Amino acid sequence: KETILLLDCLHIESKKIKFPLSKFQIVLFNSNVKHALEDGAYNTRRAQGEEGLSIIKKKFPQTLHFRDATMEQLSVVKNEMHQDVYKRCKFIIEEIERTKSGANYLKNGNIAAFGKCMYASHAGLRDLYNVSCPELDFLVEESSNIREVAGARLMGGGFGGCTINLIEQDHVAQIAETILHKYAAK
């Protein structure tokens, strides 16, 4: 109870981290944009990431996985990559670091810093991984203007669907109504 899981998909492990559900609530805002992952766009991004990791491995053979890669390594091989491949790799490396930092922020009870990680994650998904859409960006942007929303980002594979928002418990209903009204009016 009052925990979230930090999943390690490389080693198939999980860790429980304390999470103050009595103070915050996780709320999903649905963009009502249907994502069609079968069109191959997400698979293209995955392939671009694998291509980039392969280029990094050639120069740095000790780097077996993205979690071993650094931004310094990526900058060394940047000119050997297509710009889109570089952007995907940059997002992946930064997202791994955000995940580690975010887990530490939660362990230390720093919800504000964790929320900033959520917003940074969305920016990376939007600008580097290119899986957001205007509707998701609108929902995250509107949430970022509300003090009682600690953080927000798209969730899932992107290209539509929902945002996940970390909202102070006492303000959930009011904020949900505000966001719904603004979204319907746009």
Where are each of the predicted segments found?
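C-terminal nucleotide
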Residues: 2-151, 165-186
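Structural motif
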Residues: 161-163
